[in-house]
């Protein structure tokens, strides 16, 4: 079987779309690729998308030029981890602190990140 090429997308379901999009755009520097009242799609690097869905807005499916997207809606806590280079970690820690964001924990994984 051929290996998986990469993670295509991560979807988060948010109550406050403007606030969530502003965080990922203004604090983390992700570029907005597409935006609508139900979805903001952002470039998360390496051909990966971060999708922010307004909670409850995806209970009905949607027709797209690429095909039918079935209904979905996330519930409960979620976890997303972004990789940064070891040399860049102090800069990211300072940037997050400048925006009042507390770091719960720093973990170094043997596989990177």
PLM segments and residue spans:
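Vicinal oxygen chelate
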Residues: 1-8, 31-84, 90-113
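Conserved active-site tyrosine of GNAT-family acetyltransferases
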Residues: 20-25, 96
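Polyanion-binding surface elements
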Residues: 11
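Short alpha-helical
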Residues: 18-19, 87
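Conserved beta-strand-loop-alpha-helix junction that forms the acyl-donor binding cleft
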Residues: 14-17, 110-111
């Amino acid at each position: 079987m051929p290996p998986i090429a990469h993670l295509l997308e991560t979807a988060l379901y948010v109550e406050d779309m403007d606030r969530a999009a502003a965080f990922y755009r203004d604090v983390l520097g992700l570029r907005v690729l597409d935006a609508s009242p139900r979805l903001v799609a952002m470039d998360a690097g390496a051909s990966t998308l971060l999708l922010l869905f307004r909670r409850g807005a995806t209970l009905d499916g949607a027709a797209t030029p690429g095909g039918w997207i079935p209904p979905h809606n996330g519930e409960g806590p979620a976890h997303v981890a972004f990789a940064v280079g070891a040399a860049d970690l102090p800069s990211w820690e300072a940037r997050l602190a400048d925006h009042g964001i507390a770091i719960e924990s720093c973990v170094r994984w043997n596989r990177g990140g």
